[in-house]
Amino acid sequence: MKSGIHPDYHEINVIMTDGTEYKTRSCYAQPGATLRLDIDPKSHPAWTGVQRMLDTGGQVAKFNKKFGGLGRRAKA
């Protein structure tokens, strides 16, 4: 392999939604950093069958503000 072209691959801590912690290797952030998950296999709708709205940073509100009127017809 060519040297100097690959990102640093190091160990990080991952915290799942139920508080479970484990270590894995990743290019994410700095060595020893913590990645806190918002959705994981224990809380994902595809596996649990439960829908929940998760608005991280107001993204859903921003989308609705921008595109909320699409599909509505003005009454004449």
From Swiss-Prot:
It holds the Pfam family Ribosomal_L31. HAMAP family: Ribosomal_bL31_1. One of its GO terms (cellular component) is ribosome. GO terms for molecular function: rRNA binding; structural constituent of ribosome. GO terms for biological process: translation. Keywords: Ribonucleoprotein, Ribosomal protein, RNA-binding, rRNA-binding. PANTHER family: 50S RIBOSOMAL PROTEIN L31, CHLOROPLASTIC, LARGE RIBOSOMAL SUBUNIT PROTEIN BL31A. The keyword RNA-binding applies. Belongs to the bacterial ribosomal protein bL31 family. Type A subfamily. The keyword rRNA-binding applies. The gene is rpmE. This is Large ribosomal subunit protein bL31. InterPro entries: Ribosomal_bL28/bL31-like_sf (IPR034704), Ribosomal_bL31 (IPR002150), Ribosomal_bL31_A (IPR027491), Ribosomal_bL31_sf (IPR042105). Part of the 50S ribosomal subunit. Gene3D superfamilies: Ribosomal protein L31 (4.10.830.30). It comes from Gluconacetobacter diazotrophicus (strain ATCC 49037 / DSM 5601 / CCUG 37298 / CIP 103539 / LMG 7603 / PAl5). NCBIfam families: L31, PRK00528.1. Binds the 23S rRNA.
